[in-house]
């Protein structure tokens, strides 16, 4: 395990180690990618946890097991050593992500955008997104200059999202501010 070469601003969290698996140093991983197995496409991970030094690790192998992944990391052969990685976020540099088609966005690109309704009222900023099964949901939290102090949950659908202007850092939505 080495120090990480990528800057912290360049790293995107794609999963989290949450437990150990077996006695040979494998770890259980919760993947934030869709499909979840895409996390295994990235062979070098930067691990980080608040209050700890970032570590760079190499993925040797991995497999899907039920609703989580099991990963084998290079040089990690002991269950107790693997347990020490529990709670670490798995990050990769954003430049490794595949390019998307026009009009498609990664969640990290949407986080922080100002959300403005059709009347020009600032509803807040996108804090994060949730996967609900039927559609993704944007968690919009109040910010300086927003209409009120309410947190809103807006569907990330064609009916709700009218336009996204990445250069301006804004998203126009069809949403009643009272809802």
From Swiss-Prot:
Statement: the UniProt record of this protein carries the keyword RNA-binding: no
Keywords: Chaperone, Cytoplasm, Ribosome biogenesis, rRNA processing
InterPro entries noted in UniProt: PRC_barrel-like_sf, PRC_RimM, RimM, RimM_N, RimM_N_sf, Transl_B-barrel_sf
GO CC annotations, alphabetized: cytoplasm; ribosome
Cell compartments where the protein resides: Cytoplasm
PRC barrel domain residues: 102-179
Presence of the UniProt keyword Chaperone in the record: yes
Family: Belongs to the RimM family.
Notes concerning its domains: The PRC barrel domain binds ribosomal protein uS19.
Physiological role: An accessory protein needed during the final step in the assembly of 30S ribosomal subunit, possibly for assembly of the head region. Essential for efficient processing of 16S rRNA. May be needed both before and after RbfA during the maturation of 16S rRNA. It has affinity for free ribosomal 30S subunits but not for 70S ribosomes.
NCBIfam families: 16S_RimM
The protein's assembly and partners: Binds ribosomal protein uS19.
Protein's name in the database: Ribosome maturation factor RimM
């Amino acid at each position: 395990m080495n120090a990480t070469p990528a800057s912290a601003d360049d790293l995107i969290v794609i999963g989290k180690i949450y437990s150990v698996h077996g006695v040979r140093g494998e770890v259980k991983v919760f993947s934030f990618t869709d499909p979840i197995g895409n996390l295994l496409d990235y062979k070098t991970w930067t691990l980080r946890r608040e209050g700890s030094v970032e570590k760079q690790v190499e993925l040797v192998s991995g497999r899907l097991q039920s609703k989580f992944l099991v990963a084998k990391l290079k040089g990690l052969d002991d269950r107790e050593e693997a347990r020490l990685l529990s709670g670490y976020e798995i990050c990769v540099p954003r430049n490794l992500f595949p390019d998307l088609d026009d009009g498609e966005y990664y969640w990290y690109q949407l986080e922080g955008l100002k959300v403005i309704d059709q009347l020009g009222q600032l509803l807040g900023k996108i804090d994060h997104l949730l996967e609900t099964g039927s559609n993704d949901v944007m968690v919009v939290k109040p910010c300086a200059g927003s209409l009120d102090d309410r947190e809103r949950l807006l569907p990330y659908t064609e009916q709700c999202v009218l336009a996204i202007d990445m250069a301006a850092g804004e998203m126009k939505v069809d949403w009643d501010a009272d809802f």
